[in-house]
Amino acid sequence: MTQKLHIKTWGCQMNEYDSSKMADLLLSTHGLELTEAPEEADVLLLNTCSIREKAQEKVFHQLGRWKELKKNNPNLVIGVGGCVASQEGEHIRHRAPYVDIIFGPQTLHRLPEMINQIRGGKSSVVDVSFPEIEKFDRLPEPRAEGPTAFVSIMEGCNKYCTFCVVPYTRGEEVSRPVDDVLFEIAQLAEQGVREVNLLGQNVNAYRGPTHDGQICSFAELLRLVASIDGIDRLRFTTSHPIEFTDDIIDVYRDTPELVSFLHLPVQAGSDRVLTMMKRAHTALEYKSIIRKLRAVRPDIQISSDFIVGFPGETAEDFEQTMNLIAQVNFDMSFSFVYSARPGTPAADMPDDVTEDEKKQRLYVLQERINQQAAQFSRRMLGTEQRVLVEGPSKKDIMELTGRTETNRIVNFQGSPEMIGKFVDVKITDVYTNSLRGEVVRTEDEMGLRIAQSPQEVMNRTRKEDELGVGRYHG
């Protein structure tokens, strides 16, 4: 009888990526097939996130539900992974002794051995270590699930922002070798993937080892990925302003595969608050990056992250954040009220902004960004947009849905053979969270680019300095 696996995932796209890898891994090693119903499962995995408030209590609440399933099925294996597990491993083991396996983001590749240990009679297994980049060497080959795919290029973060737990839960920055990244993407392209999203806590800090002992920068990696035949769209998330260097901006100038949409977290518009957050940049420096980007990509849309009510944030500080939002004209945001994360420096700061004030500031901020997003959407009315068709629409299964380069969802009437391909759609209606349109051109009528070798793409902008060292410019 086929054994079943249920995974519940909270948090960022890195967690979603990790969960998909866990599913692929356990299918290949134990024949475990995914199920949406936890009561059907032989193995239950909870992939946790510590970003949101009361993350630990949310974990124990979920585990309490699964405890009843364990009572009815003593052979059920329960595992907790992700950032809360990394932070609170021993606490979880003591408070929820019925949990069999506790693993961190960097040890998910060891799940098969852990499950075998539990089934062999061991009472519990805890492994929340940071074994560098080992996990990527132990995962099965990538499996495409549609025309878009996420690919992790690095793990961890060295920035140690005062509010953030990531360096403590995922470790410091470690980049995957460039050949490994390119090979994974090439495999996905062969399976029909047309758009790839490069993932990392701080992707623009990527410094990938090459086969000849050199280091590949993030800008160089972007050009190499763009050269892979079949990959027509390239995204990345998330990045840090202090490492958004000019060579990355140059890629926007000369690489059309890189989309005109960027998520670049700023967190606040007040230099005083940014200093307390240890962000290592000013609001002016952030605006300078955006100005340079728009000089080479006038149509680029920018999204960001904001934390309101950080300890010590005054009404004037918040007003400076609102000014930055207006000046940059953000298209969307992920915005949160501040709440302390145990073990972070900010947790020791006096949390002197009232909850009511935090909520009010969040409402004002989100309303402003929603207004700006609505203006962008209205400007798209009557325009033609290139859409990558992802599948049937959630609103109407008789229609298709896809995304524009600027990450707008578009629903339209079309035929099944369009799925996985590009279509040009004329926008006819604008809604709060989506657009509607009519197909005016199919992929066969577009004349998309001809295949180029990686070296041809790199040579487009390669120049040598006075020492004969290659540099890449627009």
Curated annotation (Swiss-Prot):
InterPro entries: Elp3/MiaA/NifB-like_rSAM (IPR006638), Methylthiotransferase (IPR005839), Methylthiotransferase_CS (IPR020612), Methylthiotransferase_N (IPR013848), Methylthiotransferase_N_sf (IPR038135), MiaB_methiolase (IPR006463), rSAM (IPR007197), rSAM_horseshoe (IPR023404)
EC number: 2.8.4.3
Protein keywords: 4Fe-4S, Cytoplasm, Iron, Iron-sulfur, Metal-binding, S-adenosyl-L-methionine, Transferase, tRNA processing
GO molecular function: 4 iron, 4 sulfur cluster binding; metal ion binding; N6-isopentenyladenosine methylthiotransferase activity
Catalytic activity: N(6)-dimethylallyladenosine(37) in tRNA + (sulfur carrier)-SH + AH2 + 2 S-adenosyl-L-methionine = 2-methylsulfanyl-N(6)-dimethylallyladenosine(37) in tRNA + (sulfur carrier)-H + 5'-deoxyadenosine + L-methionine + A + S-adenosyl-L-homocysteine + 2 H(+)
Cofactor: [4Fe-4S] cluster
Domain TRAM: 378-441
Residues engaged in binding [4Fe-4S] cluster 2: C157, C161, C164
Coiled coil recorded as keyword: no
Cofactor: record remark: Binds 2 [4Fe-4S] clusters. One cluster is coordinated with 3 cysteines and an exchangeable S-adenosyl-L-methionine.
Pfam families, per database record: Radical_SAM, TRAM, UPF0004
NCBIfam families xrefs: miaB-methiolase, MiaB/RimO family radical SAM methylthiotransferase
GO biological process, one term: tRNA methylthiolation
GO terms for cellular component: cytosol
Purpose: Catalyzes the methylthiolation of N6-(dimethylallyl)adenosine (i(6)A), leading to the formation of 2-methylthio-N6-(dimethylallyl)adenosine (ms(2)i(6)A) at position 37 in tRNAs that read codons beginning with uridine.
Binding site for [4Fe-4S] cluster 1: C12, C49, C83
Organism of origin: Haemophilus influenzae (strain ATCC 51907 / DSM 11121 / KW20 / Rd)
HAMAP family named in the record: tRNA_metthiotr_MiaB (MF_01864)
Domain Radical SAM core: 143-375
The protein's assembly and partners: Monomer.
Places the protein is found: Cytoplasm
Family to which the UniProt record says this protein belongs: Belongs to the methylthiotransferase family. MiaB subfamily.
Name this polypeptide is given: tRNA-2-methylthio-N(6)-dimethylallyladenosine synthase
Disulphide connectivity of cysteines: none
Main location (coarse class): cytoplasm
Keyword ATP-binding annotated: no
Residue ranges of every copy of the MTTase N-terminal domain listed in the record: 3-120
